[in-house]
UniProtKB/Swiss-Prot annotation:
SUPFAM superfamilies in the cross-refs: Composite domain of metallo-dependent hydrolases, Metallo-dependent hydrolases
Name used for this protein in its record: Urease subunit alpha
Any GO MF annotation of the entry: nickel cation binding
EC supergroup of this enzyme: hydrolase
Source organism of the structure: Verminephrobacter eiseniae (strain EF01-2)
Cysteines paired by S-S bonds: none
Gene symbol of the encoding locus: ureC
Length: 590
């Protein structure tokens, strides 16, 4: 039987089982766990498009029509990186969703084909490229619409949060307050080739004004200290969420005016809640908001300005906080408020808590102390830093926060030749976990059959920093594209340009607007004149930290109020600030 060298095979068809590759300029090494293209029985039946290649009439392209099962688009030889596993496979898309993951080809001439390529099938060649689900940023201040282009260009395809533009309230808090503002933002969402969902304002001691926001289409409610995150407001807001199957996002009381972290935990009363700013400097009860990392009903997340901890982190934060929260440096109390939130000890602990899987999600806090285009980049910088400082990460024992794991990957994860488990843990922080937390995992968050085809392609050398292609609902929405007047697509200047999926009526068919079940049932789509596909959030109120994939660790947390030292299960958490990081200047010379 004819053979081919492993390197030559990888260069032609992409890596296969046992092959390893480096993620950009990080120290993270990925290993392929399984190869679904081998369902044909052996190597040699791979599909590939091009002159003299196999996807031709009568070869790997069948005669099947769409009605006979041919897919709309096939992604060939993709290296799928997902929290559930790292596998090589072909991906078939139909009707804007992932229809199949497996072996593509012509069932009349090939064995094991579960994705039919027909005359009506488009091909996206993924040989040598990494494929991930589109990222989810669940902490968006909708301050300006230009954020959306930057987020999409970074690989984020779903943005959840609140705001109305550069209003003073939105500059500080992620709330779209009231039915009128919610309606306007849902109408604006029709213009953008990303999935959007809006949080109403949850700060109220009576339920009426909160119910009307959910009825208007808000996917949940945001409690922010700048509006008064009192125990009464927290409890009332959660009462409404329980009644409407929506999420509550909490930015708790930094000043401890209306209570301490213990009072907030008591007000939550064991109900599920998204704890935004469960972190070292972003806000919430000072200095011990990290206590909630050990609570089973709190779903903790970080924003990216403190991630990872570097020697520049502390210096930039005071001025940044003063601007974002409408503070005055000439007022001593305002300055003290700002300085109380910025603690190097808790910032350092935040990195380690992410590596332990104790903080479950990453987000941006866009233009309100966070950078909307750097969620993915900073997640992988943190993973790299933690490998440098803490070494190889072993998977936890069964039942200790391991989350999902493909059968193929269970053995590979324990091999010190690769960082597969750490990769899955960090990937889950901005894909499947925010999807689960906000009730949208039935639509997005992973590469899985039936889900919306929000897919990002990466060349390994640019992984995490500059995607090659971004698909929304099965259609290319954004791409790194060369000079449109050139004779081929690659000449300089190459930069991100909107593609056909980002224009006209295609936006409405390829992107989702998330709304409440109450809003969908009330017919807000027709009433507001919305064009986008609407999808209701669901299954939220039973979600607990145990449901956070690869990030469900519940340590006993201790934070010293005087020294700010952080301990998890008795272990002191501290690390040095980074002085140099990957995915940085090397990628942004031009």
């Amino acid at each position: 039987m004819a053979t081919i060298g492993r390197r030559a095979y990888a260069e032609m068809f992409g890596p296969t089982v046992g092959d390893r590759l480096r993620l950009a300029d990080t120290g993270l090494i990925l290993e392929v766990e399984a190869d679904y293209t081998l369902r044909a029985g052996s190597y040699g039946e791979e599909v590939k498009f091009g002159g003299g290649k196999t996807i031709r009439d009568g070869m790997a392209q069948a005669q099947h029509s769409r009605a006979q099962g041919a897919v709309d688009t096939v992604l060939t030889n993709a290296l799928i990186m997902d929290a559930a596993g790292i596998v090589k496979a072909d991906i078939g898309l139909r009707d804007g969703r992932i229809a199949a993951i497996g072996k593509a080809g012509n069932p009349d001439t090939q064995a094991g084909v579960d994705i039919i390529i027909g005359p009506g099938t488009e091909v996206i060649s993924c040989e040598g490229q990494i494929v991930t689900a589109g990222g989810i940023d669940s902490h968006i201040h909708f301050i300006c619409p230009q954020q959306i282009e930057h987020a999409l260009a970074s690989g984020v395809t779903t943005m959840l949060g609140g705001g109305t533009g550069p209003a003073t309230g939105t500059l500080a808090t992620t709330c779209t307050p009231g039915p009128w503002n919610i309606e306007r933002m849902l109408q604006a969402a029709d213009a953008f080739a990303v999935n959007l969902g809006f949080l109403g304002k949850g700060n109220a001691s009576l339920p009426g004004a909160l119910h009307e926001q959910i009825d208007a289409g808000a996917i949940g409610l945001k409690l922010h200290e700048d509006w008064g995150s009192t125990p009464a407001a927290i409890s009332n807001c959660l009462d409404v969420a329980e009644a409407t199957d929506t999420q509550v996002a909490l930015h708790s009381d930094t000043l401890n005016e209306s209570g301490f972290v213990e009072n907030t935990i008591a007000a939550v009363g064991g109900r599920g809640i998204c704890a935004f700013h469960t972190e070292g400097a972003g806000g919430g009860h000072a200095p011990d908001i990290l206590r909630v990392v050990g609570e089973a009903n709190f779903l903790p997340s970080s924003t990216n300005p403190t991630m990872p901890y570097t020697h520049n982190t502390l210096d930039e934060h005071v001025d940044m906080l003063m601007v974002c929260h409408h503070l005055d440096a000439s007022i001593a109390e305002d300055l003290a408020f700002a300085e109380s939130r910025i603690r190097k000890e808790t910032i350092a602990a935040e990195d380690i808590l992410h590596d332990l899987g104790a903080i479950s999600m990453m987000s941006s806090d866009s233009q309100a102390m966070g950078r909307v285009g750097e969620v993915i980049l900073r997640t992988w910088q943190t993973a790299h830093k933690m490998k440098q400082q803490r070494g190889w990460l072993s998977p936890p024992a069964a039942g200790q926060g391991a989350g999902l794991s493909s059968a193929a990957g269970q053995g590979v994860d324990h091999d010190t030749r690769n960082d597969n488990f750490r990769i899955k843990r960090y990937l889950a922080k901005y894909t499947i976990n925010p999807a689960i937390a906000h009730g949208i995992s039935h639509e997005v968050g992973s590469i899985a059959v039936g889900k919306w085809a929000d897919i990002v392609l990466w060349k390994p050398a640019f992984f995490g920093v500059k995607p090659a292609l971004i698909l929304k609902g099965g259609q290319i929405a954004l791409a790194a594209m060369g000079d449109p007047n050139a004779s081929i697509p690659t000449p300089q200047p190459v930069h991100y340009r909107p593609m056909f999926g980002a224009f006209g009526g295609a936006i409405a068919k390829t992107s989702l607007t998330f709304v409440s079940q109450a809003g969908l049932q009330a017919g807000i789509g027709q009433r507001y004149g919305l064009r986008k596909t609407l999808s209701a959030v669901r299954g939220i109120r039973g979600i607990r930290k145990r449901d956070m994939v690869h990030n469900s660790y519940l340590p006993q947390m201790e934070i010293d109020a005087q020294t700010y030292m952080v301990r998890a299960d008795g272990q002191w958490l501290s690390c040095e600030p980074a002085t140099e990081l990957p995915l940085a200047q090397r990628y942004f010379l031009f």
